[in-house]
């Protein structure tokens, strides 16, 4: 019993000892100067007191930088804020109670100095060309490793030997350049702690200044109280300060006659006098150096307009604007507005403007003034010395003029604005009336008025029929008044559309309809289709967006049952509501059968030798489509590529790694449980393989190889001519001397030695010391001004007049330049220099018999895709350049336009051969069903019927290529045109005769190219080779659409089972393309 009692007491004491065990978390600490840290003291067991003691043995209590918090009976937290070096040492946590005494735990706190930068100023500036030393001093408790980085790279790895890291870790750049400017990173690392720190230092390189006078010689007018500005443009870094000297003496800013702009780059001399004529110097100075430029001020007397006056008149009155001017010689006075020039002594055909000029005065008379005559008028006085111009403002006061639509439609409960636009000067007051009562009124609480600077809007929220009717807008100003009646008409629901055709299939029905005769005054928003099974009462409904339906006026209802009789009707809906329905029409869906042929739309990719073929699902025949079978081949190949099986949920297939400049045909067949559909055919042509020297559109207007070679040949010929002429006159030899002796009977050089000496004397220069001065007058040209005044010469007058640019147009037609079938397009004739013309790449969709028999198809002419004028892009690429032009100078400003032909894809009937698409949308190809049966492994490859070839004109092609512009499909009513219209509408310019489809190119002008090659003894290269373009034969519903061509890319054809894209895998094809050459549409472009 005694032993058990002793054991119990022993276990009690052991449990008490464990309860007072002290743990500190974390058990050790290391922080840098200025950082903060806390320690948690955890006690096992109940403690009456938990205390913290500093390294000096003092009990810690909460103070400014130290916090001691006891959370509960078992924990206490010590927090040290903004640690200093004195805070380092061993901290002790002591826990105690009355029964067991004390228990303690310790933690050692170490404090170190982080890696810091003491002396690393930023920015640091240096002078260009000097040896720069970038300073960076690093401070840390233990040594650190310093590295320098610039633009993300270590400067040590730079191949430039100018970069050197000195022993004190400074970076030296020998002969620093402006390109060395930037941010340099001084990075320090301490391996023992894994510590890293860095400082970005901005290095600025100062560049010595340069200065240049904007005008080396400035002319001014004397004694006319005018000012002249002398300007210098200085450059350097930092921006230099500019000072001025006159005859070597500094010019102070405080002088009364002289003033400067903010940066002193412009010096203004007020009230110029003859004494101000001198040589002025502008000096630029900055931290890196100094530079100087000089300007000569030459003082003349030029015209001065002494009188102009702003005028105000009332519409239909007559007024005279007067301008007086002085000057020596007497100046001539002309008039100009913001949009036109008015010559002196001029009278318009209608007598509206009359100008009379007198000595030092001109009078401009306006008769029957209109409000459009108001604006700014400029009086220009000019003489051989200079020009003066001043503006006067002519104000026209006129009675109000009301604009805006007079009929507005709405319905009850739908607010609408009736806008009355008023043009008047002075501003008019606008009031609204309803049945003679001024609005707003208590009788019309549903009416609000909103007024603006030039308009007034009446908001009407009709709640009954009484709110519809006439509303009067009256505008009044001091000149007069005007009123206008606006009619608010109650909108109605639209009338019913008219069903023209119902074409049922197994699971779908296509409804062709005409739009309602009446829209009810507001736009139609949706169409509602309703159908039901005959014998059932439940109608099925679906709404179709009017914007999508109106394009073709076709609605397709899907999800029908095969061999089932239905009734269908249509109705239109606008904002007012749903209109009347059409009479119900009955139809019966076809039995379960093979699916309809899919539609194919081809998109030639940018690389030029691959194509994305969109597969548009049609009627599935009442049975889900299992897959699509895709076959394709080059037309010149006997064998088809391996057949591809595309999942039914895939919407397109990619054909890659095709041969360049080759015609291809693609056949796609849909298959369901009942069998295979008729094949859908797509025909297209890949572009020509781009050359390595092909320039992109962004390459600017650089010269091509042909142009450079031509220029070198011309220079070489000119040098030969110069040398031969020199030998003829100086040494009596050379080709010209030989011709003169043999054909002109001139004596040889040995017969007249004395004459040679006399000839030399004759060609010697005059020894007179008198200067030879040639005086030419400058002719001032004013647009729309036939008269010109001679200008007296001055020291700045050039001895030769500048050559005025001439309009140059190359009249040689290009290879495939044809009239494009796009709306309001200007006919263009491309040349070997400024054209890449568009070689039409066509995608042909057709229905054709099986490959074993030749398909009978209607040919669709290739469409040259060019943008319409109305949709011309805001920015255009500069025309590429190639060989120099040799054609005569011709102005093409009156180039005739060609009316485009339209095309509509008709699934049931053949297309007109001249059908085309207009330029509005990206190029697409709509493929209709064909009867051609795709080849399979069991049957031999089909032999295609030889297609008729239409020769195209050939010509010199520029290495630069441009893409063909997109086209869009027009309204079906515009589809049918005569086949020859697209070409016969082309009219030759001036006296030239052009035959686009094989014929001669004629021009009465002299062909400069023939002259040049005749002088060289070589044959003239043919600019135009006659030929005929190939005609692609397609069957019923064929469509040819040009495809876009761009950059080249050759990739393997892959087949994927994803719905997004199916890539073709098979034998890699040879890649050959002819890049599309965009038609040049800037026919009026002038070149010198």
UniProtKB/Swiss-Prot annotation:
Expressed in neuron and in presumptive neural tissue. Glycans are attached at residues 82, 219, 310, 341, 417, 443, 472. One of its GO terms (cellular component) is neuron projection. The keyword Signal applies. Keywords: Cell adhesion, Cell membrane, Disulfide bond, Glycoprotein, Immunoglobulin domain, Membrane, Repeat, Signal, Transmembrane, Transmembrane helix. Residues 724-1088 are cytoplasmic. Residues 758-802, 829-1000, 1024-1088 are annotated as: Disordered. Residues 1-19 form the signal peptide. Residues 835-847, 854-875, 913-936 have a biased composition (Low complexity). The chain crosses the membrane at residues 706-723. The keyword Glycoprotein applies. Residues 493-592, 594-690 form the Fibronectin type-III domain. Residues 20-108, 113-202, 209-294, 303-397, 400-484 form the Ig-like C2-type domain. Residues 20-705 are extracellular. SUPFAM superfamilies: Fibronectin type III (SSF49265), Immunoglobulin (SSF48726). This is Neural cell adhesion molecule 1-A. The gene is ncam1-a.
